[in-house]
């Protein structure tokens, strides 16, 4: 043992508080929202911290050393605690410095940050030819700028774009290779996850805290029973209520973006609101040529270009910011979203059908009669009818689109005033007699 005795160990007594003061005087460290943060970003694994504390203590503290290390870490959480540590959205912390949105770069790691990417900034990095060729083979040219902007969007802790992305194909195109490359770009700031799990598990959101990107590389085909958890992540702009199993809920920063690869659409079982679909950027892949021979090393080749991919993504981020966080969206992508929306809500096709109803400014029809006509249309077209309440809600939500007006002043066949719609006429007369009354 050396002759020097630290202030936190005097007369055989170990002072945890003084140890933490000494430790923080030589280490940039803070604790917020249940995690330690350093100039390298969030501390994902606390073991290196515990090992360093152990090495500092082992010469002076003998018995119960492991337990005392745990106690020190707990005291350190209190000593390094800050009330709030909000995300900073005008810069990207990288392996060799900080890149600001205006293009300026500052070398070094002078400050504690929430997220730091494991990629160096090199303004002279070569163009990522394998990456660009891969995207050209996978996607239609007009959709590549959307991917560029979305990946760039994920570089900063912001949800201003309020969009998630779904890349859809038939299988075998290689779209999930994008996730492999993004894992190299984002490192521990990206997580593999499941959109389905997020939608049904109230604890899943907390697992995405401090994360820039969540990738679902094989999205489940089942329609989501509830969409509020997914929508809250996509649109979060500030702190939200998070909950971990067995613990009290708390307010935490949420800025994880969602990216899914799938062979089908992201559908909702009950949510037919425009908002659920409006939040999706839906891109479709090209058909895989029968003569194409896949390169088994393509993921590694693209990952080796990560510094060039960073510059490419940063260009997309700058364009997105310049456009007020409005994504470039091709007519194909817009049509994809409309088709998905229609596929989940056949009320649109019913309203545009012939022989069942007619849009007519001076006509009016009760909600009940319209719903019976709609059920007839569904039965004759081998489609499943949604519930009456959902049908009326869909009409109300789209009444401006079809020049309808919801009212409670429609006179039905019995002479009673009931709810209905002005601007639509039923061309068929379904039997409104309750089935229990029929002979």
Over which residues does each language-model region extend?
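Conserved two-lobed SF2 helicase motor
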Residues: 212-215, 258, 262
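Positively charged interface segments
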Residues: 66, 70, 88, 186-188, ...
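P-loop NTPase catalytic core of nucleic-acid-dependent motor ATPases
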Residues: 24-42, 47-49, 92-212, 281-284, ...
């Amino acid at each position: 043992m050396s002759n020097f005795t630290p202030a936190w160990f005097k007369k055989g007594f170990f002072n945890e508080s003084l140890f933490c003061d000494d430790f923080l005087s030589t280490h940039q460290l803070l604790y917020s929202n249940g995690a330690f943060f350093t100039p390298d970003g969030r501390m994902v694994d606390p073991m290196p911290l515990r090992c360093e504390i152990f090495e500092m203590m082992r010469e002076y503290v003998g018995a119960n050393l492991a337990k005392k290390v745990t106690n020190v870490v707990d005291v350190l959480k209190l000593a390094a605690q800050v009330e709030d540590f909000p995300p900073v959205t005008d810069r990207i912390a990288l392996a060799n410095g900080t890149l600001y949105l205006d293009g300026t770069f500052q070398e070094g790691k002078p400050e504690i940050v929430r997220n730091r990417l494991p990629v160096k900034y090199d303004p002279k990095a070569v163009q990522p030819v394998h990456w660009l060729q891969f995207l050209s083979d996978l996607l239609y040219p007009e959709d590549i700028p959307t991917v560029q902007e979305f990946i760039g969007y994920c570089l900063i802790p912001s949800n201003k774009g309020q969009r998630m992305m779904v890349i859809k194909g038939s299988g075998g195109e290689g779209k999930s290779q994008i996730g492999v490359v993004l894992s190299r770009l984002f490192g521990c700031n990206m997580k593999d996850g499941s959109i389905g799990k997020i939608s049904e598990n109230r604890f899943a959101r907390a697992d995405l805290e401090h994360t820039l990107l969540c990738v679902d590389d094989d999205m489940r085909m089942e329609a989501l029973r509830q969409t509020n958890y997914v929508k809250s992540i996509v649109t979060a702009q500030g702190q939200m209520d998070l909950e971990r199993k067995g613990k009290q809920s708390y307010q935490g920063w949420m800025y994880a973006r969602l990216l899914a690869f799938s062979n089908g659409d992201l559908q909702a079982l009950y949510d037919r609101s425009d908002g659920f679909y409006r939040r999706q950027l839906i891109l479709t892949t090209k058909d895989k040529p029968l003569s194409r021979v896949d390169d088994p090393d393509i993921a590694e080749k693209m990952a080796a270009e990560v510094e060039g991919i960073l510059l490419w993504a940063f260009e997309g981020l700058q364009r997105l910011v310049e456009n007020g966080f409005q994504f470039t969206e091709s007519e194909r992508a817009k049509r994809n979203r409309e088709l998905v929306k229609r596929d989940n809500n056949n009320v649109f096709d019913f309203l545009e059908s012939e022989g069942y109803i007619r849009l007519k400014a001076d006509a009016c029809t009760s909600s009940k009669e319209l719903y019976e006509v709609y059920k007839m249309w569904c039965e004759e077209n081998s489609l499943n009818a949604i519930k009456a309440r959902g049908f009326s809600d869909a009409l109300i939500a789209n009444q401006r689109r079809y020049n309808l007006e919801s009212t409670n002043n429609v006179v039905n066949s019995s002479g009673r005033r009931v709810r209905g719609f002005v601007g639509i006429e039923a061309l068929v007369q379904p039997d409104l007699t309750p089935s229990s009354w029929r002979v």
